[in-house]
Amino acid sequence: MNLSSCYLEDTELPFIGYDYYPTGLGTYVEYQVDSVWQDDQIGPIGSAEAHYFLRDVNESSFVDEEGRPAIRVERYSKQNQLGGFSNIKDIWYRTRTSKIAEQNEENVVFIKHNFPVKEGKTWDGNSKNTLQTLQLIYRQTNIPKVWDYEYKNVHEPYTINGFTFDSTITVLQLDRTATLGLSVFAQEVYAKGIGLVHKQLNVIDIQLPTFGDPFDTDTFGFQYEMVVTDFGQ
């Protein structure tokens, strides 16, 4: 009897989930981005909106400082749907190892995935960041240092912006709700063979004012959403 062949036939190998974070060169995903910023303490001018479009392209490969294969991601932007993408907004870097997927966003590194993908699995997505870095990028002094990312709705279908994806995973990064104080909701959805298709990031701080009506509140924070509009190679 060939024991190795019996093992292969009778044992179900674990699903790793690399397909949810593709690294193939030339692949791209396009997004519509909507964001709202608010700061009640500076009066009527304390709010703004931004609406634009992004195209993320896995442009080339290289070896990073730790000797790992990595991807250079060119992020193009435009203000409306007309015309093509010609303006490079950012250069990011992606590294996918056998155990994790990292994304370097202007020298801020997030652990986007922890393999193998499994329902309910958790990890600290900010393990490579300092509290000072998080306070700076989110503009909140009381932002938590540890964000326990969690896999939810693993291999479930997902519909967004007219697309229906057969197999997706949701990464709930943080869900902290407060009537007063800091509320944070951060979540990303990844489709198999495509990558990120929906991102939500809401960071809102509601405080009682130092002066004035004690029943009034001041709001400071932002809401940010990315929704897939196209993808391919």
Question: What spans do the regions from the language model cover?
Answer:
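C-terminal motif of bacterial Sec signal peptides marking the signal peptidase cleavage site
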Residues: 2-5
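Conserved functional acidic sites
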Residues: 7-233
